[in-house]
């Protein structure tokens, strides 16, 4: 199974766009992990359902990975994406627990992260991976 360098805090607050260019900041959590980790983090915690539904973003990501030398099939990428998304639920809970819920921005960020994450996990049927 492929691994790569991951940002490990790939949320919209850490991505800046200007004139067609993209800058990613806040690299203190960098590590090696599954390539799908950053994608799962970004799509499940920062991207609303309406955007996730527009295109097959996992397939687009997989195409970029394979064009750049990572060789594995799309089905494996999709499965690993769901596993990463399920694992990252702990990030949503931990992050929401550290925010200042007394101010509007902190409260809204916490609500957004938790709602987006659970909605995405339900869409992916990720909880079916947990054995009773």
List each language-model region with its residue ranges:
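Secondary-structure junction/capping motif
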Residues: 31-34, 73, 108, 112
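Conserved aromatic-histidine-acidic binding/catalytic patches
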Residues: 2, 27, 45-53, 77, ...
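Catalytic activation segment of kinase domains across protein kinase-like and atypical kinase folds
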Residues: 11-42
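ATP-dependent phospho-/nucleotidyl transfer catalytic cores
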Residues: 1-7
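ATP/Mg2+ or Mg2+-diphosphate-binding catalytic cores
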Residues: 88-132
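All-alpha amphipathic helical-bundle segments outside canonical DNA-binding/catalytic cores
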Residues: 70-85
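Active-site activation/catalytic loop segments of kinase-like enzymes and analogous catalytic loops
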Residues: 35-69, 85-106
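Short acidic alpha-helical/loop segments enriched in Asp/Glu that coordinate divalent cations
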Residues: 22, 53, 73
């Amino acid at each position: 199974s492929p691994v790569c360098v991951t940002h490990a805090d790939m949320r919209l607050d850490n991505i800046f766009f200007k004139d067609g260019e993209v800058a990613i900041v806040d690299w203190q959590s960098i590590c090696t992990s599954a390539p799908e980790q950053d994608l799962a983090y970004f799509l499940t915690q920062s991207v609303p359902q309406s955007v996730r539904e527009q295109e097959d973003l996992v397939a687009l990501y997989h195409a970029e990975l394979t064009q750049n030398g990572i060789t594995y099939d799309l089905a494996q990428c999709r499965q690993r994406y769901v596993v990463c998304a399920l694992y990252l639920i702990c990030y949503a809970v931990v992050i929401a627990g550290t925010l200042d819920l007394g101010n509007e921005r902190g409260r809204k960020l916490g609500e957004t992260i938790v709602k987006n994450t659970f909605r995405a996990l339900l869409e992916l049927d990720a909880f079916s991976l947990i054995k009773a």
